[in-house]
Each structure stands twice: as structure tokens, then as C-alpha cells.
């Protein structure tokens, strides 16, 4: 598609996105080449239609009338947009996994993810997002919920998986998710799978 023809298709696609949605260059690669996409996004940013969060990452910002300012994008949404741009599979790990699973109320100082891509670290205002490479078997071919729970269990450590933790994880999962996890987590480290079997209650 010629560059002169790509503005309306890109702008139209963005206008159909919900407020707060984050998007990246690759989301429009079927409409134009990267250079043309960047020009369109730069023009839309200049017109105040979109917000540039960081290089190559944009959103349709949500305005909070009460605060009189735009709402900051959620770090997890930024992380997944970056991953989508590179074609990575990512899963929250460490304190990030604990926070997202409701096992910790502490907001992570660094939003940390395991990834099947290269190691990368990004600074977005006051937000630090870090991707660590890991073995594919820990994150591929399993559901995002199973992968998240494996990482949360690993972050806590064997001795800190109490009955309270097990019950909290149960409460954060559906019956179908536990059935899937019982099957998907078979190749996790043995002690982690033992804890997952407790969570799943021997689901089959």
C-alpha cells in the first residue's frame, strides 16, 4: 500500500480501539511499512489523537475528569505490547507474578517477566520493565494462568507455600483452569508440581 494511502486505514483502526488500548508498530504491518506507519503515528500524536508512551509504543489515553489529567498506562499492558511487537511469549515472574495473582499487595519496583526472547530492559517514566530469557518449556504450550502460577510458586519458594497461599491460588482460578493446570504443569520442577497438585486437588 502506498504511503499516501495508509493514513486513513491506520487512523481508522486506531479509532475503533477502546480507550486505554496500547498498540505498537507491528499492529499495522499489514497496512504499510514501518517508516510509513511511524509517520502516521507521529502525525496522530501531534494532533493529540494518541499518546506516545515510549519508542514504538502508543495508546489511546483515558482522561480522568476528576483528576484533570490522563491516566497512566498499566505496566503489564505496556509489557505485553512490547512482547507483541517482537513476537515474544512472556509471563510475569518474581514480585510481579505475586502481585498479579493477588499474593502480594506490594507494587513491584521493577515489572519483571520471563520471555522466550532476548534480555531487554525498558524505562518508561517511573516504570521499569525487564524481560529475562528462560527455557521455552516454562512458558510455551501452556496457558497464561498456568505459567503465571508456576512463576508465583517459584518466586515464593517451597517453604513459603502455606495452606493460606494454596487457598488464595484456588480462589484465583476456576475449576477449568485447575484441570488444565494439573495437566499442563506436569513438566515443571517436581516440587512445584507437587504444590500444584495440592492446589488442583488431584483434578483430572
Residue ranges and their predicted role:
Residues 1-3, 203-204:
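N-terminal intrinsically disordered, low-complexity, charged/polar
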Residues 133-204:
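Hydrophobic alpha-helical interaction segments
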Amino acid at each position: 500500500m502506498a504511503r499516501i494511502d495508509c493514513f486513513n486505514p491506520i487512523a481508522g483502526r486506531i479509532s475503533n480501539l477502546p480507550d486505554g488500548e496500547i498498540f505498537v508498530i507491528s499492529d499495522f504491518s499489514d497496512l504499510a511499512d514501518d517508516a510509513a506507519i511511524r509517520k502516521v503515528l507521529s502525525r496522530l500524536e501531534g494532533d493529540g489523537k494518541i499518546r506516545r508512551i515510549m519508542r514504538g509504543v502508543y495508546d489511546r489515553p483515558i482522561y480522568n475528569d476528576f483528576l484533570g489529567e490522563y491516566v497512566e498506562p498499566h505496566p503489564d499492558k505496556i509489557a505485553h505490547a512490547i512482547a507483541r511487537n517482537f513476537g515474544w511469549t512472556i509471563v510475569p515472574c518474581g514480585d510481579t507474578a505475586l502481585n498479579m495473582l493477588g499474593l502480594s499487595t506490594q507494587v513491584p519496583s521493577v515489572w519483571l517477566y520471563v520471555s522466550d526472547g532476548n534480555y531487554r530492559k525498558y524505562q518508561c517514566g517511573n516504570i521499569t520493565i525487564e524481560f529475562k530469557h528462560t527455557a521455552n518449556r516454562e512458558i510455551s504450550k501452556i496457558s497464561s494462568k498456568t505459567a503465571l502460577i508456576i512463576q508465583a510458586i517459584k518466586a515464593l519458594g517451597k517453604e513459603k507455600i502455606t495452606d493460606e497461599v494454596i487457598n488464595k491460588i484456588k480462589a484465583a482460578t476456576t475449576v477449568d483452569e485447575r484441570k488444565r493446570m494439573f495437566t499442563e504443569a506436569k513438566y515443571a520442577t517436581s516440587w512445584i508440581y507437587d504444590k500444584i497438585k495440592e492446589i488442583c486437588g488431584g483434578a483430572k
